[in-house]
Structures are given as C-alpha cells and as structure tokens.
C-alpha cells in the first residue's frame, strides 16, 4: 500500500519472534520445532511454515527440517500428526515449497509422486483433479465431516505442485512486484528436463531447462523489457564452462569452478545484474 512508516517496528517484532522461537521451540535432537513450550508435539504445519516464513534461521536448519519431515511420510503421503494423521494436500503443498526452499528438490519430487500420484491414480478419484484431504490410511474421509461424500474432489488448496514445480524445479521466480526483478534457478533433481512460464502485468516470463547425464545443463529463458535478474546454474559433476548469451549481445564464458562471482557457492554459479531478453545459458564439461 506504499505505507512504510511502520516497517522498522514490524521488522523488529519479527526478529524478536524469530529469536525466541529458535531459542525456546527448536529441538536439536528431532531437528524440528515444537508447537509450543508446553508440548512435545512437532507439527507438520508449523515446521513447514518455519521454512517458508523464514523463521528457521540457518540453511542447515531448513535442510534438517526437510529431512525430518520426509521421514514421517506414510504410504499415501505426508501425514499431519497434529491432525490425527490425516493427509492435508493444503499443508502438503506448503511442504513442497519448504523442500524446494531448503534445496531438497529430490524430496519435493518424491512427495509429489507419492501423494499427488495417489490422488491422480486411485480409482476412487476423478483421475484429473485433487482431493480436499483423506485419512493417512488412504480412506477418503476428513475430520469434522459426518459423511464421506462431503469431501471435495476438486479442491484448489491441493494444487501445490503447480507452483512448486514452477518455482523450484523449472526455477522461474519473481522477486518483486510484477517480476521487475527475477531469478532463474533450475533444480531438476532426477529429471532430465523442465519447462514453465507465466505472464504478469510487465509481460511474459518463460524458462526451459535440459540436463545431460553428467549434469551438463542448457537453460533458455525469456524475460520482458524493463526487468532484470539473476541466474543460478547448478554445477555439474565435471570441470565445466558456462556460456551465457542473449540475442543481440555478445556471449560470456565463465569458468564454473571460479567462486569469484558474487553469491556463488560450491553448488551454484550465480550471475547477477542480467538485463531482460531472450537468454541461453549452457554448461559444458571441458574434460
């Protein structure tokens, strides 16, 4: 709304809450947050939101929470121990985002195949839409509903894979309003290719990524005029060179073993200040 007068006050309150939660609620043995100071319950919803909201204060905690949640999965999906071990595709969708934010794209894809695969393939389903929720044993009931047929079989809150695959597998992310700034950060895990795209008030965004057997990557992406962003390229299992080029501009060749680029890590080469255009980034092993 353009009102920044209370920004500092709320930022301070947020930091205070984060510090208190990490001091009082983090269980270092379980690698999860407790629901409150008076219980041993470590809920699915609270822990996935700890990652998504930024309450988890280190990258290692995010990875630990992601791994601990994955250990809880049942035969039909991610159960909510705080909700009588029912499976909630709503909070399960948020769990997908949490795995993506934590950098565990493999866990994200496994949960999609497990939980949403069940919803698509079970003969009691529509085989084209997603259900509101169900018992952890696969029975199609939901707490508070006296009749089984009351469960919605076309439920908007169960559509998390759409955004999760766009944001963390294809890696098409907008960082500010309308996509004025953006990030391309593909995370294919065990997939060989991914594509995504959408349109905002500023124009069309799209990305297409293909991966070779040794981790070689070819990323083509397009962003609208007046925007800028950054590209995160996963480093392959070889000594590699990144070629980054845009239609109408001279290509750049960057050694992927060089950490001299701002924001680069052992896993990613990060190139920032990229203007809008039709770009292609290609990673090739040099030996």
Task: Go through each PLM region and give its residues.
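Non-catalytic C-terminal accessory modules of carbohydrate-active enzymes
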Residues: 19, 106-287
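Catalytic cores of carbohydrate-active enzymes
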Residues: 1-146, 254-268, 273, 282-284
């Amino acid at each position: 709304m353009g009102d920044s007068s209370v920004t500092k006050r709320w930022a301070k309150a947020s930091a205070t809450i984060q510090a208190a939660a990490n001091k009082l609620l983090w269980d270092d043995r379980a690698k999860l947050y407790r629901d409150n100071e008076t219980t041993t319950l470590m809920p699915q919803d609270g822990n996935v939101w700890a990652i998504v909201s930024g309450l988890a204060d280190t990258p290692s905690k995010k990875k630990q929470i992601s791994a601990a949640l994955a250990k809880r999965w049942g035969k039909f999906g991610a159960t909510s121990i705080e909700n009588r071990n029912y499976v909630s595709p709503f909070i399960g969708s948020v769990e997908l985002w949490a795995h993506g934010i934590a950098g565990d794209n493999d866990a994200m894809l496994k949960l999609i195949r497990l939980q949403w695969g069940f919803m698509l393939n079970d003969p009691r389903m529509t085989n084209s839409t997603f259900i509101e929720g169900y018992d952890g044993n696969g029975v199609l009931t939901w707490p508070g509903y006296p009749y089984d047929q009351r469960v919605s079989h076309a439920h908007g809150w169960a559509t998390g894979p759409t955004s999760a695959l766009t944001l963390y597998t294809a890696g098409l992310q907008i960082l500010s309003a309308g996509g004025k700034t953006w990030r391309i950060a593909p995370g294919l895990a065990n997939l060989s290719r991914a594509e995504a795209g959408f349109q905002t008030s500023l124009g069309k965004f799209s990305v297409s990524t293909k991966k070779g057997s040794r981790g070689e990557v070819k990323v083509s992406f397009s962003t609208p005029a007046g925007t800028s962003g950054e590209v995160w390229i996963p480093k392959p299992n070889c000594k590699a060179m990144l070629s980054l080029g845009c239609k109408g501009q001279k290509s750049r060749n960057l050694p992927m073993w060089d950490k001299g680029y701002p924001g680069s890590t052992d896993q990613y080469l990060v190139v920032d200040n990229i203007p809008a255009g039709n770009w292609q980034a290609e990673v090739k092993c040099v030996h």
